[in-house]
């Protein structure tokens, strides 16, 4: 069993082509990191549902189903966005996690975070006012 780095990178429409170049760089950086640290890179290239039904930001949470359906045996899994680039000398964080659920604090846009909480909270916290 290997540790898995999971990246959703589904081809977009023509107006999203410029982003894909950056996403290719991201995938390449993670591929090199995985090779260096004896991990397996798993790139989600196909949608699970039509994009109009469910955005990719939600579809990525099917990752365990995708790994199981592709007969991927895994120890630990990292889910990372395709707009990240890992430093080539980044330590193998799988060796630091103690097999616990871990996350990173990503404070890119506080406005986006606040709007997300306001707009999605009623789906998850129906009783909270």
Predicted feature locations:
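Conserved beta-strand scaffold positions in the cores of enzyme catalytic domains, especially
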Residues: 41-43, 77-79, 101
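N-terminal anchoring/stem segment of glycosyltransferases
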Residues: 1-74
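Conserved donor-nucleotide/metal-binding helix-loop-beta segment in metal-dependent transferases, i.e.
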Residues: 86-128
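Short His-Asn-centered micro-motif
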Residues: 7-8, 45, 80-82, 88, ...
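Short beta-strand-to-loop acidic/aromatic patch adjacent to the donor-nucleotide binding site
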Residues: 64, 74-85
């Amino acid at each position: 069993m290997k540790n898995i780095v999971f990246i959703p990178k589904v081809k977009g429409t023509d107006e999203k082509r410029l982003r894909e170049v950056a996403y290719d760089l991201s995938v390449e950086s993670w591929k090199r990191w995985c090779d260096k640290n004896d991990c397996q890179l798993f790139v989600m290239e196909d949608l699970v549902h039509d994009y109009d039904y469910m955005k990719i930001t939600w579809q990525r949470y099917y990752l365990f189903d995708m790994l199981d359906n592709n007969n991927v045996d895994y120890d630990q899994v990292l889910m990372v966005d395709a707009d990240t680039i890992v430093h080539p000398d980044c330590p193998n964080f799988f060796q630091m996690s103690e097999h616990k659920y871990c996350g990173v604090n990503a404070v890119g846009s506080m406005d986006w975070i606040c709007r997300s909480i306001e707009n999605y909270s009623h789906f998850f916290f129906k009783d909270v006012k």
